[in-house]
Amino acid sequence: MSSYLDFEKSIKQIDDDIANARIKGDEHAVEILNKNLEKEVAKVYKNLNEYQRLQLARHPDRPYAIDYIRSFLMDAYEIHGDRAFRDDPAIVCYVGYIGGKKAMVIGEQKGRGTKNKLRRNFGMPHPEGYRKALRVAKLAEKFNLPILFLIDTPGAYPGVGAEERGQSEAIARNLFEFANLKVPTIAVVIGEGGSGGALAIGVADKLAMMKNSVFSVISPEGCAAILWNDPSKQEQATKAMKITADDLKNLKLIDDVIKEPINGAHRDKDGAAKELASYFVSKLEKLEKLSIDELVAKRIDKILSVGAYEE
């Protein structure tokens, strides 16, 4: 069953009308309603504000890392465990082929349904998850495989156990190691990019965001609670924080914005997967033309340029 946001009510009404027309076997009505749906979808999604894009980034029907992996990674084989503590299901690692190119895919996975969300810890990795990501990244480096990182997390897990096992060290270690990997790396925010939890798999040669994704140092609710002592002012905070893909592209904090189908990734998962796979293949072709020394040097220069400003 599809989920609808407040600003999608008009779309829901037409979807319901189409379903009823199909039950009645009225194909003529279905044809007319589908045309109306196309117009309404274009109208609704044409001028989304920042808060609406945040809602889409968190949409329960939005494709997660495994959805994309199943869509475009051929001959996929999952790799488990950090070889030190346990396997963290909030981080998924696969090797396979994207557009005929062998690659490693490392992603954050939120999970669907109560049991799966609990198993995946709502997409909040423990330190062993980030260490698993590092182990697999080093494996990719050993076999000269490019890496695609799929970022989608509300943040790294802040629990006592995670802190005791070195959450901050695990994140910091990944930042250092990923900056120096001797293979092409591409990171894409596919939903939520929550602070250090996102950065831990976000250091790459190319950092992109899906059109309706967000990337921030704190959630808008958390920001509103701190600044105004009122979490309900999240819409105001969302606008002020500049967390959308277009905002971050304008601030030169990301390299590219990957377009989504006109009706959003949550309504056209296959279309979104094609856009993401196409982006990876096209950028990889350019990165593979660089020598390893050039690749790492450009990556380091890019990292050091973050935060620079002009008076």
Curated annotation (Swiss-Prot):
Entry keywords, A to Z: ATP-binding, Cytoplasm, Fatty acid biosynthesis, Fatty acid metabolism, Lipid biosynthesis, Lipid metabolism, Nucleotide-binding, Transferase
Keyword DNA damage attributed: no
GO molecular function: acetyl-CoA carboxylase activity; ATP binding; carboxyl- or carbamoyltransferase activity
Keyword Nucleotide-binding: yes
GO biological process: fatty acid biosynthetic process; malonyl-CoA biosynthetic process
Gene3D superfamilies: 2-enoyl-CoA Hydratase, Chain A, domain 1 (3.90.226.10)
Reaction(s) the record says it catalyses: N(6)-carboxybiotinyl-L-lysyl-[protein] + acetyl-CoA = N(6)-biotinyl-L-lysyl-[protein] + malonyl-CoA
One Pfam family, short name: ACCA
Entry's EC annotation: 2.1.3.15
PROSITE patterns: COA_CT_CTER
Primary location: cytoplasm
Record GO cellular component, one term: acetyl-CoA carboxylase complex
CoA carboxyltransferase C-terminal domain segment(s): 36-286
InterPro entries, A to Z: Acetyl_CoA_COase_a_su, ClpP/crotonase-like_dom_sf, COA_CT_C
Localization (cell): Cytoplasm
Domain of life, per lineage: Bacteria
Complex formation: Acetyl-CoA carboxylase is a heterohexamer composed of biotin carboxyl carrier protein (AccB), biotin carboxylase (AccC) and two subunits each of ACCase subunit alpha (AccA) and ACCase subunit beta (AccD).
Entry's family note: Belongs to the AccA family.
HAMAP family: AcetylCoA_CT_alpha
Function of the protein: Component of the acetyl coenzyme A carboxylase (ACC) complex. First, biotin carboxylase catalyzes the carboxylation of biotin on its carrier protein (BCCP) and then the CO(2) group is transferred by the carboxyltransferase to acetyl-CoA to form malonyl-CoA.
Protein name: Acetyl-coenzyme A carboxylase carboxyl transferase subunit alpha
